Regions:
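Short, structured segments at the rim of ligand-binding sites
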Residues: 1-119
Length: 119
């Protein structure tokens, strides 16, 4: 054993098997990506456990401006149903406010390419 190994901290471990459920908080980055993927579909998608943050609100607003419905569950606000435009095309002739949301700035221009007019 060398000198650096002698100073290692021994990690704790369970003395027996564990059976537990852990609720992990939502991820802003993943939540925005799920919203985009749902918007690209052909039918409504129900997202459960979505992180509600300024960035995800900006993403939902951007999608709404493109004609996507984002319906927030009245009972559980982390459940959102995303309904793509019924005609399958994103709507143009609109402006998108990105705020400081990098995911919105990176991904929405790609979606705008599929719009039926300038965005």
């Amino acid at each position: 054993m060398n000198a650096s190994q002698e100073n290692l901290w021994p990690a704790p471990f369970a003395s027996k098997s564990l059976d537990a459920t852990v609720v992990v908080p939502g991820s802003k980055s993943l939540s925005n990506r799920y919203l985009i993927l749902a918007a690209l579909g052909h039918r409504p998608v129900r997202l459960v456990g979505l992180l509600r943050s300024r960035d995800t609100e900006l993403m939902m607003d951007a999608l709404r401006s493109l004609g996507v419905r984002c319906e927030i569950d009245e009972q559980v606000d982390t459940t959102v149903t995303v309904v793509p435009p019924s005609d399958g095309r994103f709507h143009g002739g609109t402006k998108v406010f990105c705020g400081l949301a990098g995911t919105v700035m990176r991904f929405v221009p790609g979606l705008a390419m599929f719009a039926d007019g300038p965005v």
